[in-house]
Regions:
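Non-catalytic, conserved peripheral segments adjacent to functional cores
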Residues: 3-132, 151-153, 160-225
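Short beta-strand His + acidic residue motifs that chelate non-heme Fe in jelly-roll/DSBH
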Residues: 137, 145-150, 158
Length: 225
């Protein structure tokens, strides 16, 4: 049985015309980034001295104070090398809210709004996540998600509010010109599909996508929530 997509409808998301930045306990939250309802960039407070640093990577109370009340059920971690692009992914009948961050290296992380009832349907937003800036990106249910590795290697962690359902995978082309994602450092001409051949980073690193991710179609042929 499919799960109905939940809407993050608290006061944190009522004003979608401008980015609102608020400090909540040990986090600073930028809400509705890119003018897209529900997308948030979260920056934790880092307490450092000559020994190193300490930070809270997740605090349920701070999140609730920011108007974000999500029950996460699974944590995932991946390692990828430079030029790897993973995405754009979603689950159709079991949509996932994701809270993502890079714990090593540097990635460009992207979310595309696939909510049919959204005034920003088809709009994308991207943010650089790195071990240095320690930013986290909150992506509600109803979005396609992906990232590009810009460092030699990157370790990527994400919390999700529903489990992985392998028979429910969905995706869309990372390079669909109708969406027009501006992937940093990527050079190449659109071949009419999601195939990575002919694409590379500015330093000559070939773009690296899975076979599955090179078969996804564009926005017009993609599932809507």
């Amino acid at each position: 049985m499919s799960k109905k997509r939940k809407t993050l409808s608290l006061t944190a998301y009522q004003n979608t015309d401008a980015i609102e930045e608020r400090k909540m306990g040990q986090i600073t939250v930028e809400k509705n980034v890119g003018g897209i309802e529900g997308l948030c960039v979260i920056t934790p407070a880092v307490h450092g001295d000559a020994r190193g640093y300490f930070m809270e990577t997740y605090n349920e109370n701070d999140m609730k104070e920011a108007g974000i009340d999500i029950k996460f059920v699974q944590d995932n971690q991946s390692m990828s090398t430079k030029g790897v692009l993973r995405g754009l992914h979603f689950q159709k009948q079991y949509p996932q809210c994701k809270l993502v961050r890079a714990v090593r290296g540097n990635v460009f992380d992207v979310a595309v709004d696939l909510r049919a009832d959204s005034k920003t349907y088809g709009k994308w937003y991207g943010v650089e996540l790195s071990a240095e800036n320690k930013k986290q990106f909150l992506i509600p249910e109803g979005f396609a998600h992906g990232f590009l590795v810009l460092s030699e290697e990157a370790e990527f962690c994400y919390k999700v509010n529903d489990f992985y359902h392998p028979n429910d995978e969905g995706g869309m082309a990372w390079n669909d010109p109708e969406i027009g994602i501006e992937w940093p450092q990527v050079k190449g001409e659109y071949p009419g599909n999601a195939v990575a051949d002919g694409y590379e980073l500015e330093d000559g690193t070939k773009l690296n996508l899975s076979e599955k991710d090179q078969k996804w179609l564009g926005l017009k042929e993609t599932f809507r929530f």
